[in-house]
């Protein structure tokens, strides 16, 4: 939300100036705000709400689609509005087990997509579970292989090119062979490196002011529910964030 606090418009404008392929935001309202602020880049909505389909149509916001229920609702909404070939992004669940079509559902999904003209698949993607940890390497490779097979099945059902992407910040660095057509750089955009090899450099600074300083003796508590117990005499500063 709000580009990790760095400012949605400011980050979006910078990325747009550098000609990124896509921006991604959580909900449709965020995307609409970027459009109103003058951002013209393609925008993916990662958590699309059924009640926000009209907003997506009006502001050219492209939803992630992760279930048959969501797909059917989107098709119906598009047909009501007279919308055709509306760009969507298919999510495949390769192991995160939060949202996404099961790989076994892809043949059925292809058949359903072929029978309608309201939506057109722009990309297919998945999320890596533990690409930042060596202990999960075997599972990460399994996810990549599963995604490659499922996305190939999806692509074979259509003549137009469907963009594929699975790598997050850690995946970009550790699995260059899995970068496919596009990657999703998240926290790494701000220089936060999931490893200690210093390939990324921190580009942000958080500054604030001190509102008040208290001299508090040992054995007193700080904060709600008295959870912060002081083991020594302390100087406590309150700061606004």
For each predicted feature, which ranges?
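Active-site-proximal beta-alpha core segment in soluble small-molecule metabolic enzymes
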Residues: 1-165, 179
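Short beta-strand micro-motifs in enzyme catalytic cores
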Residues: 86, 235-237
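A structural micro-motif recognizing beta-strand termini
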Residues: 239-241
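Anionic-ligand-binding alpha/beta catalytic cores of soluble enzymes and soluble regulatory domains
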Residues: 137-235
């Amino acid at each position: 939300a709000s580009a990790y606090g760095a400012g949605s418009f400011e980050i979006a404008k910078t990325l747009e100036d550098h000609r990124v392929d896509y921006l991604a935001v959580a909900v449709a309202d965020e995307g609409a705000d970027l459009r109103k602020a003058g951002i013209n880049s393609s925008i993916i909505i990662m958590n699309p709400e059924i009640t926000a389909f009209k907003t997506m149509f009006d502001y050219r916001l492209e939803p992630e689609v992760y279930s048959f229920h969501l797909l059917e609702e989107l098709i119906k909404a598009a047909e009501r509005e007279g919308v055709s070939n509306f760009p969507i992004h298919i999510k495949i669940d390769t192991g995160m087990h939060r949202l996404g079509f099961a790989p076994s559902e892809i043949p059925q999904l292809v058949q359903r997509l072929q029978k309608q003209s309201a939506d057109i698949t722009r990309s297919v993607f998945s999320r890596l579970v533990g690409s930042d940890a060596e202990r999960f390497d075997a599972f990460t490779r399994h996810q990549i292989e599963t995604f490659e097979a499922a996305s190939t099945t999806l692509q074979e059902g259509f003549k137009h090119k469907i963009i594929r992407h699975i790598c997050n910040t850690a995946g970009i660095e550790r699995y260059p062979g899995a970068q496919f057509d596009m990657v999703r750089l998240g926290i790494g955009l701000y220089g936060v490196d999931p490893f200690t090899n210093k390939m990324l450099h921190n580009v942000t600074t958080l500054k604030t002011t001190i509102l008040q300083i208290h001299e508090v003796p040992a054995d007193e508590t700080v904060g709600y529910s008295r959870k912060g117990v002081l083991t020594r005499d302390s100087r406590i500063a309150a700061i606004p964030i």
